[in-house]
Structures are given as structure tokens and as C-alpha cells.
A protein has these predicted regions:
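Acidic, low-complexity cytosolic segments
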Residues: 1-25, 32-150
């Protein structure tokens, strides 16, 4: 992923964490367990573990959906005594993982995650990236923000 697109994704994840109440951490992880974007305060050793867990659970979601012929999986919830782990699939095969407090408003967190998944899918889509690079050389795009680099 190019630097400009990584910056857009980091901005989206940081904005999500700052806006949504009771969210402790957020991460976008590739299908093969590589962290693509992390909220600011995730320690590096924890990031690798979180990415591996996220990709593993996402793979289990896909397997269950396939076995039960239930269509594409959209979300998984792991409820723990000290918090919630919510995972949503992103269109390119990557996943969004959010760790939130156990008493968070799960409907709000899930809704905001859906918005982030849609925006992240646009940033991560290879076809869209190629199209933007041809159409808008030297430009970056963020929701509600546009401008030239340099």
C-alpha cells in the first residue's frame, strides 16, 4: 500500500477511535494477518498478536458462512468479561477489529464500524486506487477534504 493511502487509512482509523465513545483500540488487518492501520496507542507487540487473532477469527467467520451456505459474513462479536472484540469484513478481504468496553453502545459502535468499513474499502480497493491515481495525480482524498500534495 502506498504511503498516501496508508495515511488516509490511518486518518480514518484515528478519527473513528476519537469519535466513537468507549472504543479502546481499532485496527485494520489484511486477510493474511498483516496490520494495515492501527489506532495510535496500540503497542507493537500487541499489534502483531491482535492482527493474528483478527485474521484467524475472520477466516473462521468465512468458513462458517461457507459451511452453512449463509452468504458473506459481515460481523463477529467476542464478548469477554473486560470488553468486546467486534470484527467486520472489508470488501478487499481485510478486516476491521475494534476493542470496546463491555458497557459500550454496541449498536452505535457497529454502525460507526460499518461507515469505517465502507470508507476503508474505498481506500483499500486496488481498482479504485489505480483509477484515482490516473484521474487525480498528486491528490489525496479524505471524507470532506481534498487538496494537492506539495
Amino acid at each position: 500500500m502506498s504511503y498516501a493511502y496508508r495515511q488516509d487509512l490511518n486518518w480514518l482509523v484515528s478519527d473513528f477511535k476519537a469519535r466513537v465513545p468507549d472504543v479502546a483500540h481499532a485496527a485494520v488487518v489484511s486477510a493474511d494477518g498483516v496490520p494495515l492501520s492501527l489506532s495510535d496507542d496500540i503497542p507493537e507487540f500487541f499489534a502483531e498478536q491482535l492482527a493474528a487473532i483478527t485474521s484467524g477469527l475472520a477466516s473462521l467467520m468465512q468458513g462458517a458462512a461457507r459451511i452453512f451456505e449463509a452468504g458473506l459474513p459481515t460481523q463477529a462479536l467476542v464478548e469477554m468479561m473486560g470488553g468486546l472484540m467486534i470484527i467486520k469484513a472489508i470488501s478487499d478481504g481485510s478486516s476491521l477489529c475494534v476493542l470496546a468496553s463491555p458497557d459500550c453502545d454496541t449498536e452505535l459502535v457497529s454502525y460507526e464500524m460499518s461507515l469505517l468499513v465502507e470508507a476503508a474499502g474505498e481506500v483499500l480497493s486496488p481498482a479504485l486506487r489505480r483509477g484515482q491515481e490516473r484521474a487525480l495525480p498528486g491528490r489525496i482524498s479524505r471524507p470532506g477534504v481534498s487538496g494537492r500534495l506539495g
